[in-house]
Amino acid sequence: MEYFNVGKIVNTQGLQGEMRVLSVSDFAEERFKKGSQLALFDDKDRFVQEVTIVSHRKQKHFDIIKFKDMYHINAIEKYKGYTLKVSKDNQGDLQEGEFYYHQIIGMAVYEKDVLIGHVKEILQPGANDVWVVKRQGKRDLLLPYIPPVVLNVDVPNKRVDVELMEGLDDED
């Protein structure tokens, strides 16, 4: 089965079995909602077990979650440093114009049919996502995911067409 990374357990939270998660999920509110099914992977990326979320809340930059049948710090302390993943089957459907991060990362980025580079990472600094584009012989390009910049995303062909606004590329 194929799994996709959605977060890392960085610490426990209190004594009642809550965990502090650093999310890398594209849809954290959906991914960590009550009843969601996730998989735990250890620090060597080996599958450990399936888990069900029974509670979720945000606290600063972390998602605080609790798993079914794990209601005390002693039951969860061993999971610090483990990764949470979602199976492909549990990802859910997307609206038109929405994409999973794993679909975008690795895509070729073009401006006027000239290859700029490939998306290597997606950041979530605030109002919109920022795609980090790795370029040959240049510094990475930070590309805001907004309509005037990202013109077309072709998932089947792994291609993104963009129009770089003035000031986006400081190496030109």
From Swiss-Prot:
It is found in: Cytoplasm. It holds the Pfam family RimM. GO terms for cellular component: cytoplasm; ribosome. SUPFAM superfamilies: PRC-barrel domain (SSF50346), Translation proteins (SSF50447). Its main location: cytoplasm. InterPro entries: PRC-brl_dom, PRC_barrel-like_sf, RimM, RimM_N, RimM_N_sf, Transl_B-barrel_sf. Residues 96-168 form the PRC barrel domain. Keywords: Chaperone, Cytoplasm, Ribosome biogenesis, rRNA processing. GO terms for biological process: ribosomal small subunit biogenesis; rRNA processing. GO terms for molecular function: ribosome binding. PANTHER family: RIBOSOME MATURATION FACTOR RIMM. Belongs to the RimM family. Binds ribosomal protein uS19. NCBIfam families: 16S_RimM. An accessory protein needed during the final step in the assembly of 30S ribosomal subunit, possibly for assembly of the head region. Essential for efficient processing of 16S rRNA. May be needed both before and after RbfA during the maturation of 16S rRNA. It has affinity for free ribosomal 30S subunits but not for 70S ribosomes. The PRC barrel domain binds ribosomal protein uS19. This is Ribosome maturation factor RimM.
